[in-house]
UniProtKB/Swiss-Prot annotation:
Gene3D superfamilies: Leucine-rich Repeat Variant. Signal peptide: none annotated. It holds the Pfam family LRV_FeS. Coiled coil: none annotated. The lineage of its organism: Bacteria, Pseudomonadati, Pseudomonadota, Alphaproteobacteria, Rhodobacterales. This is Uncharacterized 27.7 kDa protein in nifB 3'region. It comes from Rhodobacter capsulatus. InterPro entries: ARM-like, ARM-type_fold, LRR_variant, LRV_FeS. It comes from the Bacteria.
């Protein structure tokens, strides 16, 4: 059943089923105008075409419309995909990276498109992410911070993006958490304080000290019972009482 926008090809021209080399599929219901068509500009119709006709994916990897190449790459044989790593369209390159064995992703570590590098960061093994620690895009580095081996994380402690530093603080070996005592972002220090409360008991930000009051041991709590902020004193007193029970 037709759905979505008017069925036009990727150049904006009306589709002509009679001129399509796959018109024989109409009778079997494996394609249909406004529903399932590899020449439609609407991605969902192209996707449906290859879901119904996966055996046709390989021969359409060179289709002139990038979205058709992307959808064909979803179901094509992986042995046909390496050449797509050099495709002119980043969406096609990204799909190839996601489907090919991880070793192929190394070729696109320096790809000019951030979406491709994001795909690479997801595919490389944790030990292979070292070259991406200095990627210019913050979201790429965030994925690296989430997946890299912990031994690489000290190199990201001073990352310009606070979201990246927060992820590093969550995963890094606790011995390195003292590097975050002077981090300019309180929310980053809060993450570090959850793991080593004692380092942040005298932090300038009440949110960080409140985290210490919630996570700290007796030594930290005894110092916080005289904190100038009511909520921190109360939390520390309550937790001390609970620990004594």
């Amino acid at each position: 059943m037709p759905e979505g926008p008017e069925p036009l090809d990727w150049t904006g021209q009306a589709l002509e089923c009679g001129a399509c080399r796959f018109q024989d599929l109409l009778e079997s219901g494996h394609c249909g105008l406004g529903w399932s068509c590899l020449n439609d500009r609407y991605a969902k119709r192209i996707e449906r075409f290859f879901l119904l006709n996966p055996e046709l994916a390989d021969e359409n990897l060179g289709h002139p419309y990038f979205e058709t190449r992307v959808q064909a790459a979803r179901t094509a044989s992986v042995f046909r995909l390496p050449r797509l790593l050099a495709d002119e369209d980043p969406a096609v390159r990204g799909m190839a990276v996601l489907r090919l064995p991880a070793a192929h992703a190394e070729r696109l570590i320096r790809d000019p498109d951030r979406a491709v590098r994001i795909a690479v960061a997801h595919r490389l093994p944790p030990g292979g992410l070292l070259p991406m620690l200095q990627d210019k895009d913050g979201h790429v580095r965030l994925i690296v911070a989430r997946r890299a081996e912990t031994g690489m994380l000290p190199m990201l402690c001073a990352d310009p993006d606070p979201e990246v530093r927060a992820e590093v603080a969550r995963r890094i070996d606790p011995a390195f958490l003292d590097r975050f005592r002077t981090d300019p972002e309180p929310l980053v220090r809060r993450v570090a304080a959850r793991r080593r409360p004692g380092l942040f008991v005298a932090d300038d930000d009440l949110r960080v000290r409140h985290t210490v009051a919630e996570e700290g041991g007796r030594e930290e709590l005894r110092r916080l019972v005289s904190d100038p902020e009511d909520i921190i004193r109360e939390t520390a007193i309550q937790r001390l009482a609970h620990l004594k029970e």
